[in-house]
């Protein structure tokens, strides 16, 4: 059934990710392992090659790698426990057949019904099968931190990727510098630990740099990783407001209200405006046991005395008399009380 005018394009959101019935325990252990790996490699770095450089007067290396380690560790731990933009679950009172439409820059979006969260999802909001939640501006589910990346923690995710790139590069440069300075010395424990730290740092550096580049391109186009993977906006992206405005909205604009702290309106004060269209319920469906009859004259049921069709009988006649307009007659003694006009056929 057409709901809007033909001039407005109605867009349907991409198909949801398949439900994955996995336990939270393995993913949580993997996220904890990543934090432990960061602490372990950093401990080896600061305890062996960096210590030797400091003892020989090279203070520039710990002055650079120290703050980068603190920033990386803080962003990694914070991202594990951050709120990606979880929306409140609905109730069973909401009708899933009701059609809700919003318009964004002359592009109409039909709000899809989430059968798990029991509400109509706003634009760019998707249900994560791993976390079993609906996330506003869903980007992707990061298994490294066992958390979704969405509207409220995307900046923290970008900070983590950037700090990991810089920290991995600083570790690699420092370890190579240490190996070059000690090339004339025999093999020692410090050299072994430097090689042990430099190999994983070099292995993580290239993938992290590519990930940072991909995320930067996505922010420039105002397109999330999930939308880019599904080719959600192949021709025209209504959320694209230009290079500078896209970066401002993604990294510096106010985040708006936290939907997990209190029930608030889904309209954000900053960002792309949503215009709520008129809500129209879905057309009624014919029950399965009621089938239309064959074409042509239909059989009429026999009338039983005292059981006529609706709108007939004595009660209907009384209602008809009550609906008749009342007239006010004037008399020399004053106005008389209103009387109903007699129906046709009455004496």
UniProtKB/Swiss-Prot annotation:
GO terms for molecular function: protein-cysteine S-palmitoyltransferase activity. It is a multi-pass membrane protein. It catalyses: L-cysteinyl-[protein] + hexadecanoyl-CoA = S-hexadecanoyl-L-cysteinyl-[protein] + CoA. The active site is at residue 142. Coiled coil: none annotated. It is found in: Golgi apparatus membrane; Cytoplasm, Perinuclear region. Residues 112-162 form the DHHC domain. Keywords: Acyltransferase, Cytoplasm, Golgi apparatus, Lipoprotein, Membrane, Palmitate, Transferase, Transmembrane, Transmembrane helix. Residues 275-347 are annotated as: Disordered. InterPro entries: Palmitoyltrfase_DHHC (IPR001594), PFA4/ZDH16/20/ERF2-like (IPR039859). It holds the Pfam family DHHC. The chain crosses the membrane at residues 29-49, 59-79, 156-176, 194-214. One of its GO terms (cellular component) is perinucleolar compartment. Its EC number is 2.3.1.225. Belongs to the DHHC palmitoyltransferase family. The DHHC domain is required for palmitoyltransferase activity. PANTHER family: PALMITOYLTRANSFERASE ZDHHC19, ZINC FINGER DHHC DOMAIN CONTAINING PROTEIN. Palmitoyltransferase that mediates palmitoylation oproteins, such as RRAS and SQSTM1. Catalyzes palmitoylation of RRAS, leading to increased cell viability. Acts as a positive regulator of autophagy by mediating palmitoylation of SQSTM1, promoting affinity between SQSTM1 and ATG8 proteins and recruitment of ubiquitinated cargo proteins to autophagosomes. This is Palmitoyltransferase ZDHHC19. The gene is Zdhhc19.
């Amino acid at each position: 059934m057409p709901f809007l005018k033909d001039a407005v394009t109605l867009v349907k959101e991409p198909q949801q990710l398949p439900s994955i019935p996995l336990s939270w325990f393995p993913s949580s252990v993997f996220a904890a392992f990543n934090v432990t790996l960061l602490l372990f490699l950093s401990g080896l770095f600061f305890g062996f090659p960096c210590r030797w450089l400091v003892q020989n007067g090279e203070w520039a290396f710990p002055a650079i790698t120290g703050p980068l380690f603190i920033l990386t560790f803080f962003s990694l731990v914070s991202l594990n426990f951050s709120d990606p933009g979880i929306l409140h679950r609905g109730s069973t009172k909401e009708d899933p057949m009701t059609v809700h439409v919003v318009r964004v820059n002359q592009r109409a979006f039909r709000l899809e019904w989430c059968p798990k969260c029991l509400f109509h999802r706003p634009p760019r909001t998707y249900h994560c099968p791993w976390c079993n939640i609906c996330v506003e501006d869903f980007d992707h589910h990061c298994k490294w931190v066992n958390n979704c990346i969405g509207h409220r923690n995307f900046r923290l995710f970008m900070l983590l990727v950037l700090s990991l790139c810089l920290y991995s590069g600083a570790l690699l440069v420092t370890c190579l510098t240490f190996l070059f300075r000690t090339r004339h010395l025999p093999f020692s424990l410090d050299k072994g630990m430097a090689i042990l730290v430099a190999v994983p740092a070099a292995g993580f550096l290239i993938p992290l740099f590519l990930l940072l580049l991909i995320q930067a391109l996505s922010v420039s186009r105002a397109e999330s990783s999930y939308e880019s993977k599904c080719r959600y906006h192949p021709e025209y992206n209504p959320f694209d407001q230009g290079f500078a405005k896209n970066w401002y909205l993604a990294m510096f604009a106010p985040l708006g209200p936290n939907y997990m702290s209190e029930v608030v309106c889904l309209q954000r004060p900053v960002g792309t405006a949503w215009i709520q269209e008129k809500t129209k319920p879905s057309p009624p469906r014919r029950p399965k046991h009621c089938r239309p009859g064959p074409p042509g004259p239909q059989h009429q049921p026999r009338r039983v005395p005292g059981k006529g069709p609706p709108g007939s009988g004595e009660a209907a006649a009384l209602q008809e008399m009550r609906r008749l307009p009342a007239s006010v007659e004037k008399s020399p003694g004053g106005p008389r009380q209103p009387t109903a006009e007699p129906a046709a056929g009455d004496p």
